[in-house]
Curated annotation (Swiss-Prot):
Binds directly to 16S ribosomal RNA. One of its GO terms (biological process) is translation. It comes from Sulfurovum sp. (strain NBC37-1). The gene is rpsT. This is Small ribosomal subunit protein bS20. InterPro entries: Ribosomal_bS20, Ribosomal_bS20_sf. Coiled coil: none annotated. Keywords: Ribonucleoprotein, Ribosomal protein, RNA-binding, rRNA-binding. Pfam families: Ribosomal_S20p (PF01649). GO terms for cellular component: cytosol; small ribosomal subunit. The keyword Cytoplasm does not apply. Belongs to the bacterial ribosomal protein bS20 family.
Length: 89
């Protein structure tokens, strides 16, 4: 355990930041999983709705500074490509 006041503060800050990051990572994983499941089930309306939610959530994480703009664009692009595949089929 830390002895200095500043070191104790840093430990608390790190714990808080770690918890927040874990929440955001899980959120991204869950929303992308929802799109994947809808696409695998070939449910067009569910896939479109899940994609709409995923797009909004991912871009909100960009505005919070959790992920970079290019990373969000790549994730959204891949999800959109999957949704378009079942649209064409």
């Amino acid at each position: 355990m830390a002895h200095h006041k500043s070191a104790k503060k840093r430990i608390l800050q790190t714990a808080k930041r770690t918890e927040r990051n874990r929440y955001y990572r899980t959120r991204i994983k869950n929303i992308t999983k929802a799109v994947h499941e809808a696409v695998e089930a070939a449910d067009m309306t569910a896939a479109q709705e899940a994609f709409k939610v995923a797009n909004k959530q991912i871009h909100s994480l960009v505005s919070k500074g959790f992920i970079k703009k290019a990373t969000a664009a790549r994730k959204v692009s891949r999800l959109h490509k999957m949704v378009n595949k079942i649209e064409a089929a």
